[in-house]
Amino acid sequence: MPTSLVTGGAGFIGAHVVNDLVALGHDVVVLDDLSGGFEDNVNPAATFIEGSVTDHVLVSRIFGEHDFDYVYHLAAY
């Protein structure tokens, strides 16, 4: 089963990408700081991590804990 990271996955477009990936059978991790999205938008089958893509320590930890096949960078600002 592929594993995907979606940054900005709590936003409008990101949440739809997450839903499609879950429907395709992916394990999905969402990284979002909720500055433009809402946690309620995140598919409950996905793992949600609240944080910023600018936090290099957090991003390094996430990549150390998961072996991603795909990364969808949809975070903005």
Where are these regions (language model features)?
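N-terminal Rossmann-like NAD(P)+-binding domain of SDR-like oxidoreductases, especially those catalyzing
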Residues: 1-77
